[in-house]
Swiss-Prot record:
HAMAP family: GatC. Belongs to the GatC family. Heterotrimer of A, B and C subunits. This is Aspartyl/glutamyl-tRNA(Asn/Gln) amidotransferase subunit C. It catalyses: L-glutamyl-tRNA(Gln) + L-glutamine + ATP + H2O = L-glutaminyl-tRNA(Gln) + L-glutamate + ADP + phosphate + H(+); L-aspartyl-tRNA(Asn) + L-glutamine + ATP + H2O = L-asparaginyl-tRNA(Asn) + L-glutamate + ADP + phosphate + 2 H(+). It comes from Rickettsia bellii (strain OSU 85-389). The gene is gatC. Its EC number is 6.3.5.-.
Amino acid sequence: MITKEEVKKITKLARLKFEEDKVEEFSSRLSSIMDMINILNEIDCTDVKPLTSVCDMQARMRPDEVTSKDHSNELFDNVQGASQQLAKEVKYFITPKVVE
C-alpha cells in the first residue's frame, strides 16, 4: 500500500502539487497499479525466451569498406545560386548572418 507520505514525496520529486484531498485518491490509485505489477512479477517466465523484436527479420550486414573518395563536390552541388562555386572552393556552407 502506497502511503500518503510516499505520495507527497513522489509529488515533491516530480515537482507536482496536489490538494490534500487528492493525495488519498492518488494513494489508492498508485497502490492498485503496484498490485497489478506485483501480479506480473509472480508469473513464472523461466522458459520464455526474451523478446528482442516483434518480427523475425535479420538485419542484412555488409562488410565495412574504407573509401577515400572526397564527396564534398557532390555535397556542395546542393548549394543554390552564385555561392555554389565559393562553397566548393572553401568547403563549407555559406549562410546569411543570423545573429546580430
